[in-house]
């Protein structure tokens, strides 16, 4: 591939602690010229010892797809950054000063921001003549109403340490809400929506027009819905209780809540296909995990129906939301009195692209809307660079 077609492309990088995902995107037409993932970064016996090696391998994979970044019309590298704190909430061109400030904010997202910064620093070194832009997961939720963003704790402490509800998966929630409006051929500003991003990480949002009114994740991505490995909402006293009675350290409890809780903590597996197999075999732990997951999901749907007052559309997205018809059914079954009438035939039918799964006479339209965070990030990059 060369730039002779005149297309402008953005290389989108999502750098995690043990994996690096990449996609070369044409932001105008939404076409991905190449996509891939480098895994097992830094693991023992892994051929990818660090993020420098990971990005070089990604470049090799791009070359294998016929992509030469020097001639591919590359105009920007977009980096997904989970947490921007109160400082960064719009797409931001990366320079040394911005990166230094992001390092200072890593305490707010110690599991996510440091590997993202490693990816940024390597990418800037390997592609020094291209603009690098950070797009923040927290950005869309920066302007949550104070009643939703504020925790009822000591105000002085909260202000001093920037403790508030930040929300995450914001790029996905914004993109899906826009795609839902386009699918319905209705103005975005006139719609009230609930978006359910259900993957290994899960989050919900209530959105009025272009403004989010609430979201399930909080100071960190640990709060809210039950997830693959994360607990979601718990009584905060569980932390001190385990420290005092089980002799665990705070870091140990935090690690347990992030990595050994949620569906995997209850059932031993986090893949919903495997969970379904265990349920069908009569595994009680798997059934309990599924019941806890859907119970929490239904609670948030009900809460956000109340927050919005009137709801036009509910959209399911991400890996589970897009592909698991049973989760969608169990999330809204019995809610006919609340205006949600699912069409089970439509729900079971597959298909690509956005599709309606509610009955035609359902007061609230229910959709499946594939997310595309990479495309949204690419478009944000072009926008901030004045393209």
From Swiss-Prot:
Cofactor: Mg(2+); Mn(2+)
Pfam families (alphabetical): Acetate_kinase (PF00871)
Pathway as given in its UniProt record: Metabolic intermediate biosynthesis; acetyl-CoA biosynthesis; acetyl-CoA from acetate: step 1/2
Gene3D superfamilies in UniProt: 3.30.420.40
Reactions the enzyme catalyzes: acetate + ATP = acetyl phosphate + ADP
Active site residues of this protein: 137 (proton donor/acceptor)
UniProt cross-references to PROSITE patterns, sorted A to Z: ACETATE_KINASE_1
Keyword Cytoplasm set for record: yes
Textual note on the cofactor: Mg(2+). Can also accept Mn(2+).
HAMAP family membership: Acetate_kinase (MF_00020)
Molecular function via GO: acetate kinase activity; ATP binding; magnesium ion binding
Site (Transition state stabilizer) residue list: 169, 230
Binding site for Mg(2+): 14, 373
Quaternary structure and interacting proteins, as annotated: Homodimer.
Protein name per Swiss-Prot or TrEMBL: Acetate kinase
Gene: ackA
Function: Catalyzes the formation of acetyl phosphate from acetate and ATP. Can also catalyze the reverse reaction.
Subcellular location: Cytoplasm
Keywords for this protein: ATP-binding, Cytoplasm, Kinase, Magnesium, Metal-binding, Nucleotide-binding, Transferase
EC number: 2.7.2.1
Protein residues bound to substrate: 80
The UniProt record lists the keyword Magnesium: yes
């Amino acid at each position: 591939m060369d730039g002779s077609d005149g297309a402008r492309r953005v290389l989108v990088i999502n750098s995690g602690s043990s994996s690096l995902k990449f996609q070369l995107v044409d932001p105008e037409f939404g076409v991905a010229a190449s996509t891939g993932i480098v895994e097992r970064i830094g693991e023992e016996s892994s051929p990818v010892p660090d993020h420098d090696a990971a990005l070089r391998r990604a470049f090799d994979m791009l070359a294998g797809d016929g992509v030469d970044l020097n001639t591919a019309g590359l105009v920007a590298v977009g980096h997904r950054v989970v947490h921007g704190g109160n400082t960064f909430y719009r797409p931001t061109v990366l320079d040394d000063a911005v990166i230094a400030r992001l390092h200072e904010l890593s305490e707010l997202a110690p599991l996510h921001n440091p590997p993202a910064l490693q990816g940024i620093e390597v990418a800037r070194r390997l592609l020094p003549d291209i603009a690098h832009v950070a797009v923040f997961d927290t950005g869309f939720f920066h302007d949550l109403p104070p009643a939703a963003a504020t925790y009822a704790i000591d105000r002085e402490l909260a202000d001093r340490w920037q403790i508030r509800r930040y929300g995450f998966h914001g790029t996905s929630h914004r993109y899906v809400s826009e795609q839902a409006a386009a699918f319905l051929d209705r103005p975005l500003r006139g719609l009230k929506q609930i978006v359910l991003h259900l993957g290994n990480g899960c989050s919900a949002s209530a959105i009025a027009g272009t403004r989010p009114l609430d979201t399930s994740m909080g100071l960190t991505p640990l709060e809210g819905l039950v997830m693959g490995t994360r607990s979601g909402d718990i009584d905060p006293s569980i932390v001190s209780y385990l420290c005092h009675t089980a002799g665990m350290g705070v870091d140990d409890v935090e690690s347990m809540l992030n990595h050994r809780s949620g569906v995997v903590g209850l059932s031993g597996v986090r893949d919903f296909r495997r969970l379904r197999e265990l349920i069908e075999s009569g595994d009680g732990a798997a059934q309990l995990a599924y019941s806890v997951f859907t119970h929490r999901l239904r609670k948030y749907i009900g809460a956000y129906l109340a927050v919005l007052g009137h709801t036009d559309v509910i959209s399911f997205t991400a890996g589970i939301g897009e592909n698991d018809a049973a989760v969608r059914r169990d999330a809204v079954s019995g809610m006919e009195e609340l205006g949600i009438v699912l069409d089970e035939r439509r729900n079971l039918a597959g298909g690509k692209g956005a599709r309606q799964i509610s009955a035609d006479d359902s007061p609230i339209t229910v959709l499946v809307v594939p997310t595309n965070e990479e495309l949204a990030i690419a478009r944000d990059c072009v926008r901030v660079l004045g393209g």
